[in-house]
């Protein structure tokens, strides 16, 4: 048996459900909405990706092109191009924001997991008390 957060994982226990939020938020309030919906849906944990855009993106001018839905009824999309660095900056948070998000997850009974890719991320997740860490 393994205990993650307030849940026991093992034989005879209910399936442990982790919601993968990754870097899909656009800041603290958006991330809190993801946590809230994961809890409302009956999740046991939520996992985010924690990174430093300056460490992750070498070429700050590298463009990324993607489609956004502009009309739900017709399915019409529009192409957007922007620096990949800017996208990652929007999806990064400060240490205090990560602490607040972890506390919010705890208050809703969700274990808080994180994927990290560098030593700074490791120190952060250890300091905020992540229940599980994935190294990418």
For each of these PLM feature ranges, what is it?
Residues 1-18, 98:
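N-terminal amphipathic alpha-helix/helix-capping segment at the start of soluble metabolic enzymes
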Residues 12-18, 104-113, 129-132:
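Short beta-strand/loop segments at the ligand-binding rim of alpha/beta enzyme cores
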Residues 20, 38, 125:
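Conserved, mostly hydrophobic/aromatic
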Residues 22-24, 49-53, 117-119, 136:
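Active-site beta-loop-alpha junctions enriched in small/polar residues
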Residues 24-40, 93-96:
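Glycine-rich anion/phosphate-binding loops
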Residues 42, 126-133:
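Glycine-enriched alpha-helix->loop->beta-strand junction motifs that scaffold or abut catalytic
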Residues 44-92, 121:
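Glycine-rich, proline-tolerant flexible connector loops at the mouths of alpha/beta enzymes
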Residues 87-93, 110-118, 131-136:
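Catalytic beta/alpha-barrel core
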């Amino acid at each position: 048996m393994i205990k993650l957060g307030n849940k026991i994982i093992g034989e005879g226990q209910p399936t442990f459900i982790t919601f993968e939020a990754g870097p899909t938020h656009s800041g603290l309030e958006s991330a809190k909405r993801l946590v809230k919906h994961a809890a409302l849906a009956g999740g046991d944990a939520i996992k985010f990706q924690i990174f430093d855009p300056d460490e992750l993106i070498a070429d700050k001018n590298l463009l990324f092109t993607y489609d956004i839905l502009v009309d739900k009824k017709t399915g019409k999309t529009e192409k957007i191009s922007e620096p990949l660095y800017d996208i990652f900056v929007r999806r990064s948070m400060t240490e205090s924001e990560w602490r607040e998000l972890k506390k919010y997850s705890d208050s809703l009974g969700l274990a808080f997991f994180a994927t990290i890719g560098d030593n700074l991320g490791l120190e952060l997740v250890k300091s905020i008390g992540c229940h599980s860490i994935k190294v990418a």
